[in-house]
């Protein structure tokens, strides 16, 4: 209203977290930041958690990783753009505090995208966070630590099963795969998955990895994966050709396209 020609706007509102169990943002007015006023102006809202602060960040809208590849041929819905970023890994005794703070944010905002930038984040903690965010469409993880299945309690297994049957996440990006089981677990956890991007190290046996992943996908009924992206520093046209040869020789896919963009090879399944 006062700046009708304003095109770019950056704003960062920080609130220090408290140590008490009854954490409340006494002075925060986040409902003013997470509103249609900003969305209608194509300004992007991000809620970021660090160990000491929670930030409400407003900045010009820019494409995120989940928007560069249009799977459904739909226009991006800016009203579904609110992002929650977690930039620290709470120890077990403070995990509930993080969950309580996320619940507070949900009183004023619906979160559609979640990014966790800390490495080796325990998947059990991720599932607890996801339980609070039923509207999630995308999930970006730095790297994960899996549970030992034999040591899971009945309650933990029930929680995993609940997420499998109730989440609607369609896009997942794992920046660093520690072992093949990381990807296999994510495929099982997200039955609505349409786009999966995996970051691999240069020493990976790409042929073995590709066979294991595609066999896993082929063995799942009603699985909707349309696009598999494999990011690897040594990716080149020769690697892409080897991948194509292994797919064809093993009959892993019949109707697909393969292409490379810089260090990422994209397998689109039709």
Residues of each region from the PLM?
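Eukaryote-biased activation of long, low-complexity terminal tails and linkers
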Residues: 1-270
């Amino acid at each position: 209203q006062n700046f009708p020609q304003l095109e770019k706007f950056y704003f960062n509102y920080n609130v220090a977290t408290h140590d008490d169990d009854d954490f409340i943002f006494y002075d925060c007015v986040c409902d003013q930041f997470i509103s249609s006023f900003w969305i209608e102006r194509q300004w992007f809202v991000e809620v970021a958690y660090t160990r000491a602060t929670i930030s409400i960040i407003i900045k010009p809208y820019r494409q995120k990783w989940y928007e560069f590849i249009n799977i459904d041929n739909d226009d991006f819905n800016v009203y579904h753009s609110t992002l929650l970023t977690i930039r620290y890994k709470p120890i077990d005794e403070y995990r509930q505090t993080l969950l309580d703070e996320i619940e507070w944010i949900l009183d004023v905002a619906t979160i559609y995208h979640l990014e966790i930038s800390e490495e080796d984040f325990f998947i059990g903690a991720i599932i607890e966070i996801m339980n609070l965010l039923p509207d999630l469409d995308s999930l970006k993880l730095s790297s994960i630590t899996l549970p030992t299945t034999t040591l899971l309690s009945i309650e933990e297994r029930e929680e995993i099963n609940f997420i499998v049957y109730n989440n609607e996440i369609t896009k997942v990006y794992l920046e660093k795969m520690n072992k093949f089981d990381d990807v296999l677990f994510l495929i099982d956890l997200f039955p609505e998955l349409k786009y999966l991007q995996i970051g691999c190290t240069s020493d990976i046996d790409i042929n073995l990895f590709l066979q294991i992943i595609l066999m896993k996908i082929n063995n799942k009924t009603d699985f909707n994966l349309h696009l598999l992206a494999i990011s690897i520093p040594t990716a080149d046209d020769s690697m892409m050709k080897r991948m194509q040869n292994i797919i064809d020789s093993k009959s892993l896919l019949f109707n697909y396209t393969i292409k490379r963009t810089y260090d990422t090879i994209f397998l689109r399944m039709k």
